[in-house]
Regions:
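Exposed, low-structure sequence patches enriched in small/polar residues
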Residues: 1-266
Length: 266
């Protein structure tokens, strides 16, 4: 197949306000290492998903995957910040994001919704010790990647709070809830993270499906950073599904076990 891609961006910035809009068209832009190979290990080039990349568990439960056969869409971001004069330890940050993608036209000339996400978040630094954040995301996606018109919808709510004891010690907590009438129904999640800068970090988390399977997906991790190297050890129960990092997605089966991650920069 002959492939092509169009990408357009426009941005605006004035004082505390900024905005960015991106539009993209893709058609057969993936390059495979072998003709008969399958999976992400057989893909030579990188096609990022131009959507908001979440770090929260439930907001990233069903991430968008680029439709390499053909998609059209884009996203828009708007930022606004309120920072009182002379008070660096107090501020408000407001952010709104919208992204949507449709499949290429089929044989009857009709395209279908692949992904839509309408989200917004507010971050508030109360003083030198306390920072809070609240996020709302309304996501709709195609479970068949545009093969049929059926879509699933999720409404996600996240509360995030960080407390700093001093310059090196802080604790952060998350409370999350996902409401849905589709697929696995409702989810809830919580996380506690302790940071002892600049070396140690500890965290425990749990996702619970209270709408269908009634299963817990717990995880605990310890990480140590030295110079430009970071090593992390974790143990937990992981659900089957796609794991995405930087827009690259791979399918992972359900498992319970431990893992070691080593990251270094040169």
């Amino acid at each position: 197949h002959t492939g092509y891609a169009w990408l357009g961006e426009v941005g605006y910035n004035h004082k505390q306000f900024s905005g960015l809009a991106t539009f993209r068209v893709l058609k057969h832009m993936n390059t495979m290492l072998t003709l008969e190979g399958q999976g992400t290990g057989n893909v030579l080039n990188y096609l990022p998903a131009l959507t908001r990349q979440y770090t929260y568990m439930l907001a990233n439960l069903n991430p968008y995957q680029v439709n390499v056969n053909g998609e059209i869409g884009g996203q828009a971001d708007v930022y606004y910040s309120i920072r009182p004069n002379g008070q660096r330890s107090k501020y408000w940050n407001f952010h709104a994001n919208f992204s949507t993608y449709y499949s290429d036209k089929n044989l009857i000339g009709k395209s279908r919704l692949l992904w839509r996400d309408i989200n917004g978040d507010i971050e508030h630094q109360w003083n030198k010790k306390i920072k809070t954040g609240f996020l709302v995301s309304v996501q709709e996606w195609s479970p068949t990647h545009g093969t049929t018109e059926r879509t699933y919808a999720s409404n996600i709510f996240v509360y995030d709070m960080t407390y700093k004891f001093d310059r090196k010690t802080s604790v952060r907590g998350e409370l999350q809830y996902l409401y849905s009438e589709d697929y696995e129904k409702d989810w809830m999640a919580a996380l506690i993270e302790v940071n002892l800068a600049p070396r140690w970090s500890f965290s425990i988390s749990d996702m619970y499906n209270n709408g269908d399977t009634k299963k817990h997906y717990y995880n605990g991790s310890v990480s140590y950073t030295f110079d430009r190297t970071r090593i992390q050890v974790n143990y937990g129960r992981n659900r089957a599904g796609y794991i995405c990092s930087g827009g690259v997605c791979r399918y992972t089966p359900a498992y319970t076990g431990a893992g070691i991650t080593l990251t270094t920069s040169f």
